[in-house]
Amino acid sequence: MTIERRTVLVGAAALTAAYATPVQASTRIPLRGMNYDTEREVWLTPYVRHDIKAIRHQLHCTGILLLGSDLHRLTEAAEIATAEGLKVWFEPRQFDKGARETLAFIKAVGHVAERLKAGLSLGCELTIFMDGLVPGKNYIERAQALATTPDYNQRLNNFLATALTTVRSIFHGPITYSSGVWEDVAWQGFDMVGIDLYRDSSNEKTYASDVRALHRHRKPVIITEFGCCTYRGADKRGGDGFDIIDWTKNPPVIKGHHVRDERVQARYIDECLTVHERQGVHGTFVYNFIETESPYMRNPKLDMDMAGFSVVKVFPDYARTGRWAPKLSFHTITQHFK
C-alpha cells in the first residue's frame, strides 16, 4: 500500500456534522501566506529580499511559512520578512534524520522564533520524513510501510509530546505541526491545528467538508500546504503532481505528453482559497512561491517549471540574474489576499 498526499482525511466527512458548524459566507482569513523554501542551490540575500518584498507587497500576504534545514538561511529570511511586516512561521526540516537530531534542530529554531516573536511548526509529515517512527530508509519506503506499522500514530504523538515539552521551555509563541492527512495527531497541547491538505481527484467532492471537519478540535485551523502544478490534469493529482519527470535522462525530461497550462494552477488555487475562506480557517499557506531549480523552458520536454508548484517561473539564467515572472496563479492569489 502506498500512502500519497492525495490520501483523504479518514472519517472527516462523517465527523463534520457532529463537530463542525458550516460557515455560510466567505470570511477574511487572518493569516494569508506563502510557503517559502530555503533549500536551494542559489541563496543570495538580494534575491531573497526581492522575493519576500513581492510576497508582502504584491501578493499582499500577511504571513510566510519558512521551510528548511539551514539555521542561517531560516534566520536571514525571517529577519527580512519580519522587517517587511510579515508574520513569520518556521517549519524546521531535518529529513531522514532521527529523533535526537530532529529535536535538537527544532529547539535551535525555537530560540530564533522566540527572539523574532514568530510561530513554530514542529515539522512536516514526520511519519514519512523522519527516521525512526516508521521503518524505511527514505520517505518512499516509509510511506509504503505505514500500512504494516499500526502504531505509527502513537509513535508520532510520543515524539510530538516530547518536542512540545522541550520547545515550551524556551519558546512562548504559537505552536502547530504540519501534519499529513494519514496522521492522527493529538492536538491537545498545540495552539493550532495544522495540516498539509491538497485537493485531488480522490477528495475533490469532499474537500470543503474535510476542511470544515478540522474545526472539531476546537482550535484555530491552519492549512500549512496546498497547491498545484502547472499542466493539464495537475489539478486531479494535487500534491503528487510533481511526479512527471524522468530523472534517468540527462538532462531530465518531462514524461509523456503533458501540456503546460497556467490556468489549471490558477483555477485550483482560486477554488481552494474560496473553500478556506468559506470554512473559516485561521491561516492558509500556498505551496510554493519559487522553485529555483525548476526553470521554465519553451521546449515542453525540458520545462521543469511545468512540474513545479511555484507561483512564479524562473528562467535558465536565474543564478546570474535572479529573474522570475509571475504565473497566472500569482494574480489569483493577489485578488484573494489584497
Regions found by a protein language model. Give the residues of each.
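N-terminal secretory signal peptides
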Residues: 1-3
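Aromatic-rich peripheral "rim/lid" segments of glycoside hydrolase catalytic domains that contact
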Residues: 287-338
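Boundary/entry segment of secreted carbohydrate-active catalytic domains
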Residues: 26-54
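Active-site groove signature of glycoside hydrolases
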Residues: 109-153
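N-terminal export signals
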Residues: 7-25
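Aromatic-lined carbohydrate-recognition surfaces of secreted/lumenal glycan-active proteins
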Residues: 157-183, 223-225, 286-287
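Glycoside hydrolase catalytic-domain groove-lining segments
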Residues: 186-253
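Catalytic domains of carbohydrate-active enzymes, especially glycoside hydrolases
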Residues: 48-70
